[in-house]
Amino acid sequence: MQVFQTIHPCCCGLDVHKETVVACVRRTGADGTIDQELATFPTTTAGLLGLGDWLVERRVTIGAMESTGVYWKPVWNLLEGRLELMLVNSRDVKQVPGRGSTELAEVKTDVKDSQWIAQLLASGLLRPSFVPPLPQRELRDLTRTRASLLQDKSRTANRLQKVLEDANIKLAGVASDVLGVSGRDMLRALIRGDRSPAQTADLARGRLRLKIPKLTEALSGRVSEHHRFMLRLLLDQVEQYEQQVSKLDQRIEEVMSPLQKTALQMLDEIPGIDRRAAQNVLAEIGTDMSRFPTSSHLAAWAGLCPGNNQSAGKRRGGRLRQGNRWLKATLNQCAWAASRKKDSYFAAQHRRIASRRGVKRATMAVAHSQVCVCWELLKNGQAYQDLGPQYFEKLNEDRTKRQLVHRLEKLGYTVTLQKQDAA
């Protein structure tokens, strides 16, 4: 008995694993009869090319697979262009009702999984994930690798700081950046062990030289040979990470297309978003905003909007939706930077929400606004124009007057308002 309406008469469900791919070709006749053909292929290049030939011979026009780790990528790369492909979230496949009442629920096997994917695809019940073109996927690899290396560098710097604390070197309490130019000179002097604390402190540069007495006291620790070995090892690791990040920066600039570089300049104008962050954003969302009908769709895809929690006509606070964690992390950092930029709309928005809902919610709200601004700029190709720090006060002048009068009255003042004539 046919349960679902047929949208794709000839399609294929792919159950992808590390070493094998199980394919189920599903054909639905005009009279509703269903014919299924199953085959298993290795995930070697020859095996996947054979899978493509097998599907083309059977005139399959569309196939679907779950986003299983990184194992789906070789399958997608070799089948892309030969037929329409759909990558779906495993959660969406499991949450579709109906499998529990069919014979597919009796035993869970790779064959049953491929048949279920094919059945959902044939019925049009699968929601495709956004898979960008190959150049953008390669740019993503570069930006995500750079982000991972920067995280590794931060962790290594924290380990280095722990070694300094173990040696009772309080350099971080005096110098704002232990890994700055002055800080590294002092670290190398500590590693060599050929200078007194006063001589090491004398390596300070710029404004840090005003703190030489404090530096001398902070550098008077007990540095053993073990500490020197660990400091040398960790400082070398930090410098290696910096060299690798520099190579990635250069490579990212090389592979970006002229269109992406134009978009990069537009995003770089947004407060809180620097060039590196703009590269990360473009690598995740691309320049073609037709994939996202509205800015709200993009915000939801990025995981920067609350989930739905509504009952009896009342909306309650909900947890953030799952989304693109790389894009969310980048925009969270950008939102925090924007909140500290004076005389900007985002800073005013952050202050306004933080006073009522807290800093974390305010930062997330600014990140939501930033991703919506990114969509508007990329969609319309227009330059960024800041609304200004007075936007919310001008938006509701009466409320602003009431709030200010109330604050003065609480201090014991009697307030009389008189509007000035325009000059």
What are these regions (language model features)?
Residues 1-423:
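A detector of single, family-specific signature residues
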